[in-house]
């Protein structure tokens, strides 16, 4: 995680489309690329193991 709140806000205050994976601004209601309304906040913790 980031060391200070400004950086954390800059990195994680984004929404990710669950259909195409595009990043969208925080207040978006639908995806800028495909128009899908299913947006999730960007994950704060890594999911994969990387192997």
Curated annotation (Swiss-Prot):
Keyword Metal-binding in record: yes
Keywords: Metal-binding, Ribonucleoprotein, Ribosomal protein, Zinc
Cross-referenced SUPFAM superfamilies: Zn-binding ribosomal proteins (SSF57829)
Protein name (database record): Large ribosomal subunit protein eL40
Domain of life: Archaea
UniProt binding sites for Zn(2+): 17, 20, 31, 34
Organism: Thermococcus kodakarensis (strain ATCC BAA-918 / JCM 12380 / KOD1) (Pyrococcus kodakaraensis (strain KOD1))
A single MF term (Gene Ontology): structural constituent of ribosome
UniProt similarity note: Belongs to the eukaryotic ribosomal protein eL40 family.
Chain's gene name: rpl40e
